[in-house]
Amino acid sequence: MKASPHRPTKVLIHLGAIRQNIQQMGAHIPQGTLKWAVVKANAYGHGAVAVAKAIQDDVDGFCVSNIDEAIELRQAGLSKPILILGVSEIEAVALAKEYDFTLTVAGLEWIQALLDKEVDLTGLTVHLKIDSGMGRIGFREASEVEQAQDLLQQHGVRVEGIFTHFATADEESDDYFNAQLERFKTILASMKEVPELVHASNSATTLWHVETIFNAVRMGDAMYGLNPSGAVLDLPYDLIPALTLESALVHVKTVPAGACMGYGATYQADSEQVIATVPIGYADGWTRDMQNFSVLVDGQACPIVGRVSMDQITIRLPKLYPLGTKVTLIGSNGDKEITATQVATYRVTINYEVVCLLSDRIPREYY
């Protein structure tokens, strides 16, 4: 979607906050642990290239979801190691070698498909993915891991790492987490040669299970100042939210009692009211279920009245304000704050989704 810089709606990204969060997390993990920054999905909506450039001296490498995200970083001049976390198409192997990416290997079938097509694997670097209980991708049996490692090494592949991903590291109960950890450790113990890099720590594990860190961590949600558990667990130390979403009033009017707002006429004023229009809607990632949620104007909570439209919302103001008055949807305004987690709670979702859904139509500004 094409960015719309000629309207007041924008996402502000505090790059210094991201760097401080990395340093804060780094101070609470074992010395010498490698720090990999997860910048997939456009850095969780924060802007992959801008974020990666800002933090490249603070991390040891980057993690992305797919080959295209990795190419974007290389073409922007980023030279640090890049691990592609998802399963790549067979055709991506040549690109991985050309751009010096590290691929994830998650099954014997993928390896066999490469061998059947006689793909030259010499010089390729990979990490083996273990499905210890997440249930998405990865090896589940130690025998398959051993077979994969042997096959890859026989064909000139450097098996640099092995990793898993915890499903419940951000929850109160540790039972399933511990079961996953034991499955992963069992596979490691069965290997004739454990790869150089062993990593199982996503943001939640890095925050709440420091004792289980191997020799690398993958910093994702928390790096951007978000609590991976939402409101379930308190952060063990302070992190700074890096993202602010703001817009401005573009139309202000006084309406009489009985006036209706929005599609379906779902809101009817019960008295004379001041109603303002803000140019943001579900096409920007501000979803339809945000009706009745309050945004901030002049440090005051102002409810969204009527349904969220594709491009606009209407809000009820306590008084008349001039056009151009700032509206904060995520972030601080006066002495009040709206967090991505509060938005997520209202939507019955997670803060990851809230920031990832902010569309490319909204320009990102960095400071």
Swiss-Prot record:
GO cellular component: cytosol
Residues where substrate binds: 136, 310
Cofactor: pyridoxal 5'-phosphate
Keywords: Isomerase, Pyridoxal phosphate
InterPro entries xrefs: Ala_racemase, Ala_racemase/Decarboxylase_C, Ala_racemase_C, Ala_racemase_N, Ala_racemase_pyridoxalP-BS, PLP-binding_barrel
A GO MF label: pyridoxal phosphate binding
EC nos: 5.1.1.1
Family named by the database record: Belongs to the alanine racemase family.
Chain's role: Catalyzes the interconversion of L-alanine and D-alanine. May also act on other amino acids.
Protein name, per record: Alanine racemase
UniProt source species: Streptococcus pneumoniae (strain Taiwan19F-14)
